[in-house]
Amino acid sequence: YIEIKNAGKTFLQNGETFRALDCVSLSIEKGEFICLLGPSGCGKSTLLNAIAGFSPVNEGCIKIDGMEVTKPSTENVTIFQNYGLLPWRTVLKNVQLGLEAKKVSKTERKEIAEKYLELVGLSEFKTSYPRQLSGGMQQRVAIARALAVDPEIIFMDEPFGALDAITRMKLQDDILRISKDQKKTIIFVTHDIEEAIYLADRIVVMTPNPGRVKKVVEVKLQQSRDRTSDDFLELRDKIF
């Protein structure tokens, strides 16, 4: 479904060429949950932005459904760490944003937005404004907004990185449940090994300078994942 072949990405920095990605090759199936895992500066966000079309590769190629990626697609959405909510809009109106761009009727927009707010457990906050919500709740609104447009692929760039540990674990449970129910293709950037094991079908482990794929680890755990199980801890040690 997503084919990455010998992908490379270079930038000019202070007159010198900086190589962010080097010879990255990877195949991703439709409906897979893929985590890009590695330390800061290993190119995982660069790779995510290249697949999403925000900053295409300048070596090799990336194809989605046989089409080369040269720009962002309206079929896909990206969820960032900073939520990206509009402060002057209510929660309900924020979730409707992508639907407005797709020219969905007012009545249908409201119905769809309410459905996804219910899915993320925020129905009672639909008339609230982002400033009235906690960080975790704001990220739930961002997730509802992403799902409302029924995207083909959801890109998530360290979406829970700014949250406290307990809120992060709750949102991991939410996104795992949603990914199983909605069967979306999700590409998720993280530097947290346990988060990657908890969420992913496969983990792409990356190394820095330049960003390369070190190995791809299949996560063969039960659907109900237990962070304290022997299998989980064994996999963590294997990746580490």
Which residues make up each language-model segment?
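Conserved ABC ATPase "signature" region
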Residues: 96, 107-124, 177
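Helix-to-loop junction immediately C-terminal to a conserved catalytic motif
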Residues: 52
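Short coil-to-helix segment of the ABC ATPase nucleotide-binding domain corresponding to the Q-loop/switch region
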Residues: 89-96
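Conserved ABC transporter NBD signature motif
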Residues: 60-72
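Catalytic Walker B motif of ABC-type/P-loop ATPase nucleotide-binding domains
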Residues: 154-157
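The feature captures the beta-strand-to-loop junction immediately N-terminal to the Walker
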Residues: 37-39
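Conserved signature/switch motifs of ABC ATPase nucleotide-binding domains
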Residues: 128-131, 149
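Hydrophobic anchor residue at the start of the ABC signature
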Residues: 79, 143
